[in-house]
């Protein structure tokens, strides 16, 4: 697969008139996920595809900081909002059963450098709202397609959830207020409230997550219940 092939994928989407109008009129913060390279990819398994895919992504979606800049970043919008854009692809371990009892190299999703950056940036933020944009939902999981995100469907902190639990505990310890998560990846929209009193892991502040559906892919309903580890309560799904 060549760079030209990846360019062609982007051009194909822009053949749609409504898609073009949307991006001409609406400011958008862009981040990549799996389908910019290959379904549910990881660097260890698909390194040969990642380089041309990353170049094509940057060709069509310029990112502040230039091509040498990593894709995770913070964007500030006055005193009200800081947006923390995460990269859940470049630093992850390959997919597994995601049920490791302890954190380790095989449970990485963000990786230690990005986690340290996120903690520092959120701890220093003076914005009223802290929006965390993290491509993949926190409590949804798709065992039929591989356990590609944080969750695994089991009622305890396992696998990649160790990393998420650490971040949520940090937010509580530092008393960081008004944190909202935005995610996508799945082919439906959902609003989820996370409540410690309903959770297995309870060392976090209540927060909301909003999941957006796709612009140019089919939609379908969730096929599994939400992972109960962090006490998710579904308020909307479409």
Give the positions of each predicted feature.
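Metal-dependent phosphoester/phosphodiester hydrolase catalytic core
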Residues: 1-238
């Amino acid at each position: 697969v060549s760079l030209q092939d990846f360019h062609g994928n982007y051009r194909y989407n822009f053949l749609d008139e409504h898609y073009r109008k949307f991006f001409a009129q609406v400011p958008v913060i862009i981040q990549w996920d799996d389908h910019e390279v290959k379904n549910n990819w990881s660097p260890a398994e698909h390194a040969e595809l990642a380089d041309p895919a990353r170049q094509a992504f940057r060709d069509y979606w310029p990112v502040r900081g230039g091509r040498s800049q990593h894709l995770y970043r913070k964007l500030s919008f006055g005193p009200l909002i800081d947006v923390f854009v995460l990269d859940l692809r470049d630093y992850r371990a390959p997919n597994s059963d995601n049920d490791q009892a302890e954190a380790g190299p095989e449970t990485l999703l963000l990786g230690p450098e990005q986690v340290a950056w996120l903690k520092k940036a959120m701890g220093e933020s003076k914005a009223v709202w802290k929006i965390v944009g993290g491509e993949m939902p926190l409590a949804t999981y798709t065992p039929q397609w591989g356990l590609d995100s944080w969750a695994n469907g089991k009622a305890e902190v396992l696998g990649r959830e160790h990393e998420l639990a650490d971040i949520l505990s940090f937010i509580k310890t530092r008393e960081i207020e008004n944190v909202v998560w935005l995610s996508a990846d799945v082919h439906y929209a959902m609003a989820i409230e996370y409540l410690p009193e309903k959770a297995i892991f309870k060392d976090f502040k209540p927060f909301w997550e909003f999941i957006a559906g796709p612009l140019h892919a089919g939609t379908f309903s969730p096929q599994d219940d939400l992972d109960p580890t962090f006490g998710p309560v579904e308020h909307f799904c479409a």
